[in-house]
Amino acid sequence: MTTDIIPVMSMSKIYTNKQKLTQVICAIVWCLLGSGVIFGFASIKPILIKEGIYSSLCSPEDDLPFGKACDNQDLKLNKLFSYGAAMTNLTSLIVGSLLDSYGPKFCGYIGCCLITLGSIILSYNQPLYQYFDSYIVGYVTLAVGGPFVFISCFQLANTFPKYSGTILALISGAFDT
């Protein structure tokens, strides 16, 4: 009895350099637009003040011009950023473990879902604010989603080993921008 040997095809795909470059560019844009949005707080804080976020914390005696925050409002807004920044760093530990166990695709999906959820919470903060502090919850949800997106993109530095340092620098720069 003879047995024919059937060649086993590799499950890994071979990508062209154009496809690899497209993937790296998309990851950089993804990190730029989604992963580090909480670090633009200095730019958004004046807008939050003008929108009257946490203005209920100000007393009527605070005679401030429009666009200026009272001390309590300013402290609460700073607390918002502090919670977000702390959660970004704490989440990095969790992301590393999940990345090792489930891979970058899984972590990318989680990051996408968290960033979407945080955006929805912040978009509908007026009706939600009566039940919980939707600004902090939405902002922290954005902050937690960022590292899932950012760290899952690191593996793309291996697509072009000769330029791995440059790719990592671009991804890191996109996160902090």
Please state what every model-predicted region is.
Residues 8, 12-20, 35-136:
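First extracellular/luminal loop
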Residues 32, 79-86, 140, 169-177:
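Transmembrane alpha-helical cores of Major Facilitator Superfamily
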Residues 28, 78, 109, 136, ...:
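Conserved glycine-rich helix-kink/hinge and helix-boundary motifs of the Major Facilitator Superfamily
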Residues 1-3:
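Intrinsically disordered, low-complexity cytosolic terminal tails
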Residues 130-149:
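Hydrophobic core of transmembrane alpha-helices in multi-pass small-molecule transporters
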Residues 25-30, 138-141:
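Alpha-helical transmembrane segments of MFS and MFS-like solute carriers/permeases
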Residues 48, 145-172:
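Intracellular juxtamembrane helix-capping segments at the cytosolic ends
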